[in-house]
Amino acid sequence: FESIWNKNANPTSTDFAISAICSILENGEALKKNLSDLKIRNNLLKSATVAGLAFSNTTTAAAHSMSYPLTIHYGIPHGVASSISLLPLMEINRKLIKEPLDRICNNNELTYDELKQTIKDIPKGVVPYTLDEWGIPEDQLPTLAAESFTKGRMDNNVVDLTKDDVLGILKELYSE
């Protein structure tokens, strides 16, 4: 998703990102039901590679920038830390990424609300996915928000985010 809502997005990066996202949406829940299915695992490995191709065209943006203090201070694994904010960021960036979101929804036969729910469901039962579940004290959210501004990452987001915006996202991610 970060390659889609990135100021450096281009048709190639967007196509790679949409391909990776659609494959993850198609295979994520299936893997939870059958962890030993090598075909599904292979599909997800290909998705990760294609997502990497998208990033190689754009670099990363707000989700990665916000992930760094989560990993450094609380040991949240990189993949979780960099994906935990995707839903609120998708909503913030939604108006500027309508066409790619429509393609993702159409390719997966989902409404926008179903897309959000599918994304939310993928990590359920697999990894903790709220900041509270990771043991982050709520009074640390302002500090995390202040530390979330990595030059060359946060400023790639198509919507310019303020510290208050990031604090709002972190509060949204705190608990369900």
Task: Name every feature range the model reports, one short phrase each.
Residues 11-22, 60, 80, 95, ...:
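Alpha-helix N-cap/helix-start motif at coil-to-helix transitions, marked by capping-box chemistry
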